[in-house]
A protein has these predicted regions:
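Conserved acetyl-CoA-binding loop of GNAT-fold acetyltransferases
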Residues: 114-124
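Short amphipathic alpha-helix that is part of the acyltransferase structural core
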Residues: 1-28
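A conserved beta-turn-beta hairpin within the catalytic core of GNAT-like acetyltransferases
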Residues: 57-65, 75, 97, 123
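Conserved acetyl-CoA pyrophosphate-binding loop and the N-cap/start of the following alpha-helix
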Residues: 74, 78-86
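A short helix-loop-beta-strand connector motif used in the catalytic cores of GNAT acetyltransferases and
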Residues: 32-42, 97-99
Length: 132
């Protein structure tokens, strides 16, 4: 496995989202995501993009982990963990002191996030979204 500190190609981004169970996105949505994230990391195995993750953030204090996705055939091999550890190291290296790091955790990813120190915010706060 090789970690690549950049965004995956658009076709791979769209495929990873769909094949890993994340909601599908359009090419126009992918274009914005690929161009405007604070940091990206993707993993390749035998020339295939098999996992990815990115950070949204202001570079000051707020950072949000997004698009953590691993193809089902490659889950359970530590690839997602390696990507998340790389992303967190980028924040710790380049952000000012005491960054605020968030993510939205679907059920399959929660054990990984807990192992790396993330805690649920409920009942103090709950994630919300605006359907649209």
């Amino acid at each position: 496995m090789n970690l690549i500190p950049s965004a995956p190609p658009m076709a791979d981004y769209l495929r990873l989202r769909a094949d890993s169970g994340l909601s599908p996105r359009t090419a126009a949505q992918a274009e914005g995501a690929l161009a405007n994230s604070w940091r990206w990391c993707h993993a390749m195995v035998d020339g295939e993009v098999v996992a990815m993750g990115r950070i949204l953030g202001d570079g000051g204090w707020y950072f949000h982990i997004a698009d953590m996705a691993t193809l089902p055939a490659f889950q359970g091999r530590g690839i997602g963990r390696a990507i998340l550890e790389w992303l967190l190291a980028e924040i710790r290296t380049h952000a000012p002191e005491d960054p605020y790091i968030t993510l939205m955790a679907d059920e399959p990813g929660r054990p990984l996030y807990r192992r790396l120190g993330f805690v649920e915010t409920a009942p103090r706060s709950l994630g919300m979204w605006l359907p649209g």
